[in-house]
Amino acid sequence: MEKRGWSGNTRKHDMKTLSAILNRAIKTKEYSGNSYPFGKDGFCISALEEETRKRYLSQEYLDKLMNTVFANKPREVARRLFLFSYFCYGMSFIDMAYLKRDNIKSEGGGKYLVYKRHKTEHSKNARFIRIPLTNELCLLLQWFRDNTLLVSDYLLPFVSKDYVGEKLYNHLRSRLGRYNERLREIGEELCFQEKLTSYVSRHSMAMTLQSSGVPREMIGQVMGHKDLSTTNTYLDSFGAVSYT
């Protein structure tokens, strides 16, 4: 990867995706884990991280994205996936890709998306994240059911075949690349100042919550941070942010 000129953060993201898929394969007994490359004594994924500016959308650009419907279907699918991530408090690509019908739970008279982040689901303190199924999310899910091909019980059109293991990893990696390419095209068409990527939805929601006065403890909970210090570090890093 490094020889191909990929950045540390790109390599980190790919390694995290691979780790999540292997962890899932171990959980479903499709992989023994004997040659697991990560963990306590394995490869340190975090060592690949490089400091970058965190780009987020201003409310003006968020409104522009929400109110623009594209005739080009791949772009419209990508736009709605970005908004789904945003309304799910910046849910990551890998967590969205694995969402299935059984992640929808009825609790206390309401419906919720309930899941664990793949990034931390095997850690000791991993906890479930509960996201209320708002009207915006219900409408998006209905649109995907009506306008895209969904495989098995998946809620979103990322997985197009019942792949497992390495095939699933390669498949999702390819899908992420296409998703980000469509987002780049959207950003250019809407005249955003910088490149639109899947990460921008998470950063945008973080700034929306913070600017609305939501306590950092609550922001950390809905974003799946392991502790308050993680949330503080994340939010404080927006000091030198650029508006897309």
Task: Show where each model-derived region lies.
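N-terminal DNA-binding recognition helix of tyrosine site-specific recombinases/integrases
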Residues: 3-38, 91
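Conserved tyrosine-mediated DNA breakage-rejoining catalytic core shared by Y-recombinases
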Residues: 40-41, 98-143
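Active-site/catalytic core of tyrosine-dependent DNA strand-transfer enzymes
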Residues: 62, 134-193
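Short, polar N-cap/turn motifs at the start of nucleic acid-interacting alpha helices
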Residues: 103-111, 192-194, 214-233
